C-alpha cells in the first residue's frame, strides 16, 4: 500500500498542479457553457440530474438517462411465509412482521435503509476496507435419508467473515458531475478550497503540503458510477464470534424426490450436531444498485490488439453547413458615433483549422540531451560535394620506417624551366569510373536512428485478436509536447471593423489653392473610421451541406449491432506529433528491408556530438594518401656502419609503385570518434519479402474507449435440447453460481426457511464487461482487401505553424483579371494642400451637387493687402456628397508626404497562400565548442597527448631476448610523453580505421631540425647540364586558385637562414609592386577585422624586375583570416603544361558551401518542417509619428504576421489506436542503463520455465543497486522543489504570495515567478514584497525624460495622450524588453490569481498643472491615466475610476520643476497596469513634463 502511494505521489502532484489551472479555466467557462453535454430530467416539477435514481411511487423506480426518464415497476415476491405480513410506509412490498418469541427477534434493530448514492471518489487509493457481508443463502441441497430426531442444539458460533475477494475490474468512468457553483473565496486561493475536501478523509492535503482554504459549499451529487465486476470468492475464514441472528432466508428450490426410507424408531436425544455445511448458493436475487467503483485491479497481461470494429450505422443528419460565399458588400453607411469600449468578450469558439503555416525559422539549439542508445546503421549516403581543404592538422607521431624501395631507373636531369605565368583555373576533370565494390566489412556499430520513412500502405487486415481485459484507469498524463503547426485553415471571413481611432487635433486651414489636376492613384492609406452597419443583404443561396457536427451527448448503451461491412481504408492522415519516448520494447524479429527513401537534402552541420561507443573494426581501407612532407628531424647519431653501397648520384623519384600486398592484421587500434552521418545512398533494389514475423508480444491495454451507440437487439437463440439425467455423483465442494437449470417437477414441501426481507427491485443492469479471452484460435487466412473507407471527419484545428522564412521571389505572374471594385472607403480628413500642379485638361462636367446653404452676403470691399494668417475657423456643415464624376486623366504625381504615425491595426486580411521556400541561407559560422559534459564512466584509453620535446636519438642497443607475454594490465593514466625513440622496424600495415571527426585546429608547430641523411641511392648517369634561362619578369598576382589536392611527397629542402623580424608597420596605401624582397618572418596574427565592402578592382601594376630568389624562410604561424581583398585582374593564359600523372586519391573534403540557387523548379510537396531558428532580438520601439489623416480604404492586405502561440486548447478526445509500428532496431545497453539495471551477466541462468516472458524472473542474488537509490533521492528532491519552489529561475514560484507561504523566512527582493506554470522558460523576474505578499512588475522603460513633448499654437485644454497623440511617444510597456509578450501573458494569469492591484505614477512638471490648478482652484487640468482595459482614470467622477494624489507640487506655473504622485488601487485587477498618460496643461513652448512609472503590484 505504501509503495503504491510512493509511486503515485509524483503523478498526484502533477494532477494537483494541473487541477489548479483547470479549476481556474473551469470557473471562467462554467458560467458560459453550462453543463456541457449532460441533460437533466424534470418530472412533476422536480429536476433530476443525469443518472439520478428516484421512486415517484412506492411500486415504481425511475432513472434519468440524458434527458429521458426510464421507469420500471417493482415486483413483489409472490408468497411470504409468515402469518401477518406488513407493508412499511413508502414501500411497495410487504414484509413479515418480526414478533418477539418467534425466533426471529431483531433486538430493536431498525430496518436496513435504501442504499445511498455513491459519493465522488477521488482518484486516491484508500486503505483496504473491512470484509464484506456474507453472501446470500444457497439453494436447498438434495434431500437426505431421514435421520433420528434430535434435540434442538444451542446456536453455534458465527464464523468470522472471510477476507475480501480479488478486486473487480474497474467500471467505465461515469460522466462528469454537474458543476457546482463556485464556493466563497477561501483564506488561501481558489485551489486551496478545492483541495480542502480531499484533505478531510484521504489525508492528501497533508501529503501535498497545501494550505487549506475555507470549505466551499457542497456541490450537487455526481452521477452514479457503473457497477464493478464481481470479485471472486475469498477463502473461508476461521469461525468468528456468534453474530446476531440473520433474517430468514428464502425458501430453497425443491430437491428431487428421494427413495422412501425405512421408518426408524425414535432414538434418544442426540448431542448437539456440528454446524451443517454451507448450502448451495441460492438463485440470484434482484439486481442491486450499482456499487461504487472497485479498487483498481492488478495489471493484466497485455491483450492482443482487437480487430477493427464494424462500421457504425449512418449518423444523424449533420448540422447546418458552412456559410455560403460572402455576398457582395453593401454600400458604406454613414459614420456612427463612437461607442464606449465594451467589456472583455468571452472566449469565442475555436476557429476553423487554418492552412498549414510556412516553416518557422530554426530554433535555438536545445540543451544536449542524454546519450541515446546507438541506432542501427543508416544506409550509406550519396557522396557529399567536395568541401574546402581543412586546416593543416597537428603533426602526427613519427611513423615506422618503411621498407627500402627498389632503386628506380635513373632519369636524366632536366634543365630548369622558365617560370610560367600563373594559369587560370582548369575545368574540373570528368568523374572517374566507379571502382569495383570492396568486400563486405564486418557490421559497423549502430548509427544514429534514421529519420522515419514514409508511412507504408495499410497492410491486410489482421486476425481478430482476443479481447483484452479492461485496463486500470491511468492517472492523468502530463501535458504532451506542443504539436506541430497544423496546415493553414480555409480563408476566414473578413473580421469586424476596428474601433474608431482618436480624433486628431484640428489643423490650421490652408490657403485655398487652385484646383490641381487629378493625381495618380495614391498609395492605400490607413484604415478609415468604420461605418455603421449596412442594411441586411438579401438572403443568401442555400449553402452546401455542412461538415459533420461535433458528437452529441453519449447515448444509452444499445444492444450489440450486427457487424457492418468492412470499411474502406481512410484517407492518409497528417503526420502526428512525435509521441513521448516509450519504454524500450522487446527485441522484435528483423523486418524485411524497406525500399530506400529518396536522398534528403544535406542537413546543416550539427554541433559536435559526443564520441560514439567503440565500433567494431572496419574493413581494410584503401591505401591512405601520402602525407604532407614531414619537417626535418634532428640530426641523428651516426648509425652503425652500413654495407658499402655503390656510389652514385641520387636519381629522381621513381613513379609510385603498385600497392603492396595486404599485410597481416594489426592489433585493433583505438576507436576513432564517430564520423558524421552520411547522406542516404541511392535507392537499392527492393529486397525480397521477409518471412512473416512471429506473433508480437501483446500490447499494453488501451484506454477504455467511449461506450458505443446502442445496437439493435439480437434475436433470441434457439432453445437447446434437454440433456440426459446423469447418475448422482458424490457430493462435491460448493461450486460458484451455476446457471438456472430447467424447472424440476414439484417435490414434497420442504421445511420452511426463515423469511428474509425482500430486496428492492433493481434497475435494469447495464451491459456486462467483456468475458475472459478464449483460447487462441488458429491463424486465419489473409482477408481480402476491404473496400475503401469513407473519409474521416475533419480534424480539429491545429495550432498555427511558426512563421516560415521568406521564400524566393517567384516568377512574375501574368497580369490577373481586374478584381472587383473595392468598397468605398469613408471620406478621409482634409490633407495638407499640395504644391500647385500644372493645369490638367478640364474633366467632364460632374453632376451638380445639391445646393449648399446660403452664405451671409458680404460687403464688397476693396482688395486689401494679404493679412496675417488667422486662427482656424470651425468647419462648416458638411454638404451632401455629389455623385462621383467620371475619372479624369491621371495628373502629375504629387510630392511624397511625410511619414504618418502608425495607424490603428487594420482588419485581419485573408491569409495568403504559403510563399515559396526561399533559397538556402549561407552556411553559418561554426559555433564554439560546447561545454564539457560531466565525466562519463570509465572510457577507452584517452587521446594521445601533445608530443613532447624531441629527445636525442639514443645509441642503438643490442637486441634483448624476447620476454614472455605478460597479462594485459588495466589501462593506466596517460603518462607524460617520453622522448622520441629511434624509429622501429616497419610493422605490417594495419587495417584502415574509421575516419575520425575533424580535430580542433592546432597551432602550427615550429619547424623541426634537419632529419638524418638517407642512405645514398644508386648512382645514376650524369645528365647533360642545361643552359640556365634568363629570369622572367614577375607576373601580377593572380586570383586565388582552388585548393589543389595534396601532391606526392617532395624531397626535403635545405634549411634557409631565418630572416629578421620586421616591425609591424601601419598599413600604407597600395604601392606599385617593387622587386621581390626576401621573405620576412610571419607577423603576429592580428585580430580579425570586420569584413569590408569589396573595393573596386585596382589597375594593373607595372611588373617589377625579378629579384634574386631568397632562401625559404621559416614557416610562420598561420594568421587569422584577413578581410576579403579586392579581386585582382585575370592573369594571362599560360602555356598548357604536360599532362601530369594521375594524383593520389584525396581525402574526402568537407561539405562545400551551397551553390547559387538554381532556377525555380516545379512546386514541390510540402517538406518536413525545419527546426526553429533562433529568435532575433526585437528592435527598439521607434517613436510614434503624428497621427496622419485617414486615407481611402486600401485593398485587402497580405496575411498578417503569425500571432504568438495561443494557450493550449482543451484536451481533445482520445484518438483511435494506430496500427502497430515496425519492429525497432536492436538496442545496446548503454552505460546509463547499465547503472540502473545492473550489468547483465552472461552466466546468469535463463528465466525459469514457469515464468512467462513478460514477468520478472526471480532475483536470487537480491542485489541492491546504489544507482536506483541515488535516482530516487534525486527524484524526491525534485518533487520537494516542485511542491515548494524557491523562486529561482529553475524553480520559479507561481506568485510572491506562494513564495511567502512556502518560505516565510525569505526577504523582500527580486525572484522568478511563473504564473501560467508549464515550462519554466517563460518565467519572469519580479520584485516580491515579503511583508505583504505583493508581486510587483516594473515598467520598461520606467521613466519618460522631462522635456517639451507637445507644442500647439492653440491649446484647447483637452487631454493629449503621450502614447497615442505625441510624436515619439509610446504606451508604457512592462517586463523584460527582450520578450515583452511574455510579461503580458504572465500578467493575464497573475490577474486570475490576485484580488487587488495598485500602482503609483509620478508626473514631473515645469509650468504644467498636474492635478489642482492653483489659479482656477479646480481640477479641470488634472492629468488623465489610461488603464490596461482602455479605461480612463481621472481626478473627478465615479469614485471607482478616480485616482488619489499623494503629493502635488505642480499646481503653479512658476518655472520650477515639481511633481505630482498619483496612486490607483482597485480590486478589478484588469484595469492595471497604467499604459498611457494624458496631460491637459501642455502645448506651450515653456511647458515640459516627464513621467516616472512605478511598478504594478498584485496581491
Curated annotation (Swiss-Prot):
Biased amino acid composition, Basic and acidic residues = 710-721, 776-787, 1063-1072, 1127-1141
Query: Low complexity: which segments have biased composition?
Result: 212-227, 322-340, 427-443, 604-626, 694-709, 742-758, 826-841, 1093-1114
Give disulfide pairs as residue numbers.
1296-1328, 1336-1497, 1405-1450
Q: Which Pfam families match?
A: COLFI, Collagen, VWC
Q: What is its main location?
A: secreted
Q: Give start-end positions of Gly residues composition bias.
A: 732-741, 894-903
Q: Which residues carry this modification: Hydroxyproline?
A: 290, 293, 296, 611, 617
Question: Which residue ranges does the record annotate as region Disordered?
Answer: 104-1268
Give the matching SUPFAM superfamilies: FnI-like domain
Keyword Metal-binding tagged: yes
The Swiss-Prot or TrEMBL record describes its family as follows:
Belongs to the fibrillar collagen family.
Q: Which disease does the UniProt record connect it to?
A: Ehlers-Danlos syndrome, classic type, 2: A form of Ehlers-Danlos syndrome, a group of connective tissue disorders characterized by skin hyperextensibility, articular hypermobility, and tissue fragility. The main features of classic Ehlers-Danlos syndrome are joint hypermobility and dislocation, and fragile, bruisable skin. EDSCL2 inheritance is autosomal dominant.
What's this protein's name?
Collagen alpha-2(V) chain
Amino acid at each position: 500500500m505504501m509503495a503504491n502511494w510512493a509511486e503515485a505521489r509524483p503523478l498526484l502532484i502533477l494532477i494537483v498542479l494541473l487541477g489548479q489551472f483547470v479549476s481556474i479555466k473551469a470557473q471562467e467557462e462554467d458560467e458560459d457553457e453550462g453543463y456541457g453535454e449532460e441533460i437533466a430530467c424534470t418530472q412533476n416539477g422536480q429536476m433530476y440530474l443525469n443518472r439520478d435514481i428516484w421512486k415517484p411511487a412506492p411500486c415504481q423506480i425511475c432513472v434519468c438517462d440524458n434527458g429521458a426518464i426510464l421507469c420500471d415497476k417493482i415486483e413483489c415476491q409472490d408468497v411470504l411465509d409468515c402469518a401477518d405480513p406488513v407493508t412499511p410506509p413508502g414501500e411497495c412490498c410487504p414484509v413479515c412482521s418480526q414478533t418477539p418469541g418467534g425466533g426471529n427477534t431483531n433486538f430493536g434493530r431498525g430496518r436496513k435503509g435504501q442504499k445511498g448514492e455513491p459519493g465522488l471518489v477521488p482518484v486516491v487509493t484508500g486503505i483496504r476496507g473491512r470484509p464484506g457481508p456474507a453472501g446470500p443463502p444457497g439453494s436447498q441441497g438434495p434431500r437426505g435419508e431421514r435421520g433420528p430426531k434430535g434435540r434442538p442444539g444451542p446456536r453455534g458460533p458465527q464464523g468470522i467473515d472471510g477476507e475480501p475477494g480479488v478486486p473487480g475490474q474497474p467500471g467505465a468512468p461515469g460522466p462528469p458531475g454537474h458543476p457546482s457553483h463556485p464556493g466563497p473565496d477561501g483564506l488561501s486561493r481558489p485551489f486551496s478550497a478545492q483541495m480542502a475536501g480531499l484533505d478531510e478523509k484521504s489525508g492528501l492535503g497533508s501529503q501535498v503540503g497545501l494550505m487549506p482554504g475555507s470549505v466551499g459549499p457542497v456541490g450537487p451529487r455526481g452521477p452514479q458510477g457503473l457497477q464493478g465486476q464481481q470479485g471472486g470468492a475469498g477463502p473461508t475464514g476461521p469461525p468468528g464470534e456468534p453474530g446476531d441472528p440473520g433474517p430468514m432466508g428464502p425458501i430453497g428450490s425443491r430437491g428431487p424426490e428421494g427413495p422412501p426410507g425405512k421408518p426408524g424408531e425414535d432414538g434418544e436425544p442426540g448431542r448437539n450436531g456440528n454446524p451443517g455445511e454451507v448450502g448451495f448458493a441460492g438463485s440470484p436475487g434482484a439486481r442491486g444498485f450499482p456499487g461504487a467503483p472497485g479498487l483498481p485491479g492488478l495489471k493484466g497481461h497485455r491483450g492482443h490488439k482487437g480487430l477493427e470494429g464494424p462500421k457504425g450505422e449512418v449518423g444523424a443528419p449533420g448540422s447546418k453547413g458552412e456559410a455560403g460565399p460572402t455576398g457582395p458588400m453593401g454600400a458604406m453607411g454613414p459614420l456612427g458615433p463612437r461607442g464606449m469600449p465594451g467589456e472583455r468578450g468571452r472566449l469565442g469558439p475555436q476557429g476553423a483549422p487554418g492552412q498549414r503555416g510556412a516553416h518557422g525559422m530554426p530554433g535555438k539549439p536545445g540543451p544536449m540531451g542524454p546519450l541515446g542508445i546507438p541506432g542501427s546503421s543508416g544506409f550509406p549516403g550519396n557522396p557529399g560535394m567536395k568541401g574546402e581543404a581543412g586546416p593543416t592538422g597537428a603533426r602526427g607521431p613519427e611513423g615506422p620506417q618503411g621498407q627500402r624501395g627498389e632503386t628506380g631507373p635513373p632519369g636524366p636531369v632536366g634543365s630548369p624551366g622558365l617560370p610560367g605565368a600563373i594559369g587560370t583555373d582548369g575545368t574540373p576533370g570528368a568523374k572517374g569510373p566507379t571502382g569495383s565494390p570492396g568486400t563486405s566489412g564486418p557490421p559497423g556499430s549502430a548509427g544514429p536512428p534514421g529519420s522515419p520513412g514514409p508511412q507504408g500502405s495499410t497492410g491486410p487486415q489482421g486476425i481478430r485478436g482476443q479481447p483484452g481485459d479492461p485496463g486500470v484507469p491511468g492517472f492523468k498524463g502530463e501535458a504532451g509536447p506542443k504539436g506541430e503547426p497544423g496546415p493553414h485553415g480555409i480563408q476566414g471571413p473578413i473580421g469586424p471593423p476596428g474601433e474608431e481611432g482618436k480624433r486628431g487635433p484640428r489643423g490650421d486651414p490652408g490657403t485655398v489653392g487652385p484646383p490641381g489636376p487629378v493625381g495618380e492613384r495614391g498609395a492605400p492609406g490607413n484604415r478609415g473610421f468604420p461605418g455603421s452597419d449596412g442594411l441586411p443583404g438579401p438572403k443568401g443561396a442555400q449553402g452546401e451541406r455542412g461538415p459533420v457536427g461535433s458528437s452529441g451527448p453519449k447515448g444509452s448503451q444499445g444492444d450489440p449491432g450486427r457487424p457492418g461491412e468492412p470499411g474502406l481504408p481512410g484517407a492518409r492522415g497528417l503526420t502526428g506529433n512525435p509521441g513521448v519516448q516509450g519504454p524500450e520494447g522487446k527485441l522484435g524479429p528483423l523486418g524485411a528491408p524497406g525500399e530506400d527513401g529518396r536522398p534528403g537534402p544535406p542537413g546543416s552541420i550539427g554541433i559536435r556530438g559526443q564520441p560514439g561507443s567503440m565500433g567494431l573494426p572496419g574493413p581494410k581501407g584503401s591505401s591512405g594518401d601520402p602525407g604532407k612532407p614531414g619537417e626535418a628531424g634532428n640530426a641523428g647519431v651516426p648509425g652503425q656502419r652500413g654495407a658499402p653501397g655503390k656510389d652514385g648520384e641520387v636519381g629522381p623519384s621513381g613513379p609510385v609503385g603498385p600497392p603492396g600486398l595486404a599485410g597481416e592484421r594489426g592489433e585493433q587500434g583505438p576507436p576513432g570518434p564517430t564520423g558524421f552521418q552520411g547522406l542516404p545512398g541511392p535507392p537499392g533494389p527492393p529486397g525480397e519479402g521477409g518471412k512473416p514475423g512471429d506473433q508480437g508480444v501483446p500490447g499494453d491495454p488501451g484506454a477504455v474507449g467511449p461506450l458505443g451507440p446502442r445496437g439493435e437487439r439480437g434475436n433470441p437463440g434457439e432453445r437447446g435440447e434437454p440433456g440426459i439425467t446423469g447418475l448422482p455423483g458424490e457430493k462435491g465442494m460448493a461450486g460458484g453460481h451455476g446457471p438456472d437449470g430447467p424447472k424440476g417437477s414439484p417435490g414434497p414441501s420442504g421445511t420452511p426457511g426463515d423469511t428474509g426481507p425482500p430486496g428492492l427491485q433493481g434497475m435494469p443492469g447495464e451491459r456486462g464487461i467483456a468475458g475472459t479471452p478464449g483460447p487462441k484460435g488458429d491463424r486465419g487466412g489473409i482477408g481480402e482487401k476491404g473496400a475503401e473507407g469513407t473519409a474521416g471527419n475533419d480534424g480539429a484545428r491545429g495550432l498555427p505553424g511558426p512563421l516560415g522564412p521568406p521564400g524566393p521571389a517567384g516568377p512574375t505572374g501574368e497580369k490577373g483579371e481586374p478584381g472587383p471594385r473595392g468598397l468605398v472607403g469613408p471620406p478621409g480628413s482634409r490633407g495638407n494642400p499640395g504644391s500647385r500642379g500644372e493645369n490638367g485638361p478640364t474633366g467632364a462636367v460632374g453632376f451638380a451637387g445639391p445646393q449648399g446653404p446660403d452664405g451671409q452676403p458680404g460687403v464688397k470691399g476693396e482688395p486689401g493687402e494679404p493679412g496675417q494668417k488667422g486662427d482656424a475657423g470651425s468647419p462648416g456643415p458638411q454638404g451632401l456628397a455629389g455623385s462621383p464624376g467620371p475619372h479624369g486623366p491621371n495628373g502629375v504625381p504629387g510630392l511624397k508626404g511625410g511619414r504618418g504615425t502608425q495607424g490603428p491595426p487594420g482588419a485581419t486580411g485573408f491569409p495568403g497562400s504559403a510563399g515559396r521556400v526561399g533559397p538556402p541561407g549561407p552556411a553559418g559560422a561554426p559555433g564554439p565548442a560546447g561545454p564539457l559534459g560531466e565525466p562519463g564512466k570509465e572510457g577507452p584509453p584517452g587521446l594521445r597527448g601533445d608530443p613532447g620535446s624531441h629527445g636525442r636519438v639514443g645509441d642503438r642497443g643490442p637486441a634483448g631476448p624476447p620476454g614472455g607475454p605478460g597479462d594485459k594490465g588495466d589501462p593506466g593514466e596517460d603518462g607524460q610523453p617520453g622522448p622520441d625513440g629511434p624509429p622501429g622496424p616497419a610493422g605490417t600495415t594495419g587495417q584502415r580505421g574509421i575516419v575520425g571527426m575533424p580535430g580542433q585546429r592546432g597551432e602550427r608547430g615550429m619547424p623541426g631540425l634537419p632529419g638524418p641523411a638517407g642512405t645514398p641511392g644508386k648512382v645514376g648517369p650524369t645528365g647533360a647540364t642545361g643552359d640556365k634561362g634568363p629570369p622572367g619578369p614577375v607576373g601580377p598576382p593572380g586570383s586565388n586558385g582552388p585548393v589543389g589536392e595534396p601532391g606526392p611527397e617532395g624531397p626535403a629542402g635545405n634549411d634557409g637562414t631565418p630572416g629578421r623580424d620586421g616591425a609591424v608597420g601601419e598599413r600604407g596605401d597600395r604601392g606599385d609592386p617593387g622587386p621581390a624582397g626576401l621573405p620576412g618572418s610571419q607577423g603576429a596574427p592580428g585580430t580579425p577585422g570586420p569584413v569590408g565592402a569589396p573595393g573596386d578592382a585596382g589597375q594593373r601594376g607595372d611588373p617589377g624586375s625579378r629579384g634574386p630568389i631568397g632562401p625559404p624562410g621559416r614557416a610562420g604561424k598561420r594568421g587569422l583570416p584577413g578581410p576579403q581583398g579586392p579581386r585582382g585582374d585575370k592573369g594571362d593564359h599560360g602555356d598548357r603544361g604536360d599532362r601530369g600523372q594521375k594524383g593520389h586519391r584525396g581525402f574526402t573534403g568537407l561539405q562545400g558551401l551551397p551553390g547559387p540557387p538554381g532556377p525555380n523548379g516545379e512546386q514541390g510537396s510540402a517538406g518536413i518542417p525545419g527546426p526553429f531558428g533562433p529568435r532575433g532580438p526585437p528592435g527598439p520601439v521607434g517613436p510614434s509619428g503624428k497621427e496622419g489623416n485617414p486615407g481611402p480604404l486600401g485593398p485587402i492586405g497580405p496575411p498578417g504576421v503569425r500571432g504568438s502561440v495561443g494557450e493550449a486548447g482543451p484536451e481533445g478526445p482520445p484518438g483511435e489506436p494506430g496500427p502497430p509500428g515496425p519492429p525497432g532496431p536492436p538496442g545496446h545497453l548503454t552505460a546509463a542503463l547499465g547503472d540502473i539495471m545492473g550489468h547483465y551477466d552472461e552466466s546468469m541462468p535463463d528465466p525459469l520455465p514457469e515464468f512467462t516472458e513478460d514477468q520478472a524472473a526471480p532475483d536470487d542474488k537480491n542485489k541492491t543497486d546504489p544507482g536506483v537509490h541515488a535516482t530516487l533521492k534525486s527524484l524526491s528532491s525534485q518533487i520537494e522543489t516542485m511542491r515548494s519552489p524557491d523562486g529561482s529561475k529553475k524553480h520559479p514560484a507561481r506568485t510572491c504570495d506562494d513564495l511567502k507561504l512556502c518560505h516565510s523566512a525569505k526577504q523582500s527582493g527580486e525572484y522568478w515567478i511563473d504564473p501560467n506554470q508549464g515550462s519554466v522558460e517563460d518565467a519572469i523576474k519580479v520584485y516580491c514584497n515579503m511583508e505583504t505578499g505583493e508581486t510587483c512588475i516594473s515598467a520598461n522603460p520606467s521613466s519618460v525624460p522631462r522635456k517639451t513633448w507637445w507644442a500647439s499654437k492653440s491649446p484647447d485644454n483637452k487631454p493629449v495622450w503621450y502614447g497615442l497623440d505625441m510624436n515619439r511617444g509610446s504606451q508604457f510597456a512592462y517586463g523584460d524588453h527582450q520578450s515583452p509578450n511574455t510579461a503580458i501573458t504572465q500578467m493575464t494569469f497573475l490577474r486570475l490569481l490576485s484580488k487587488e492591484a495598485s500602482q503609483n505614477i509620478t508626473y514631473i512638471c515645469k509650468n504644467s498643472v498636474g492635478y489642482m490648478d492653483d489659479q482656477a482652484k479646480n481640477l479641470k487640468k488634472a492629468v488623465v491615466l489610461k488603464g490596461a482595459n482602455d479605461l480612463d482614470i481621472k481626478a473627478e467622477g465615479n469614485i471607482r475610476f478616480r485616482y488619489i494624489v499623494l503629493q502635488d507640487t505642480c499646481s503653479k506655473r512658476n518655472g520650477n520643476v515639481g511633481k505630482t504622485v498619483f496612486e490607483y488601487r482597485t480590486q478589478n485587477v484588469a484595469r492595471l497596469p497604467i499604459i498611457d498618460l494624458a496631460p491637459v496643461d501642455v502645448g506651450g513652448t515653456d511647458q515640459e513634463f516627464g513621467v516616472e512609472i512605478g511598478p504594478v503590484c498584485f496581491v
